[in-house]
Amino acid sequence: MTQDVNDAAAFAAATGAGPQAIADLERYRSYLAEWNEKMNLVGPATLDVFWSRHAWDSAQILPLAPDALTWADLGTGAGLPGIVLAIMGKDRPGFHVHLVDSLTKRCRFLNEVVT
């Protein structure tokens, strides 16, 4: 899917994300920017294009398995695509995303994001 998703409004229009999902993604983006200063979670230049590079790229996976309720993001790193999938599926009963990473520091970041 090729689409210009340069901001939260465009992301909402492209995905049908509601206000709470957008607020949760903004919160995630804030955590990502803050923690990225301490450890290299994503390339610094990609923070400026969060909506197209991270949120939209991650959200595009959902339509490929529309009935899937359980997802595993192995080697999740910064939580992509897992955190975005979890936010987008939050209102679906039984929807779960498992985030798996081998580095303790990244797991600390992920725990901070999801709590």
Task: Label the predicted regions.
Residues 59-115:
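Conserved SAM/SAH cofactor-binding pocket of Class I
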Residues 5, 22, 42, 49, ...:
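Extended aliphatic helical segments
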Residues 23, 45, 49-56, 80, ...:
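Residues at secondary-structure transition points
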Residues 1-44, 48:
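N-terminal auxiliary segments of SAM/dcSAM-dependent transferases
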Residues 34, 38, 50-69:
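Conserved alpha-helix/loop element of class I SAM-dependent methyltransferases that forms part
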Residues 25-29, 35, 54-55, 80, ...:
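Broad hydrophobic/π-residue packing in well-ordered secondary structure
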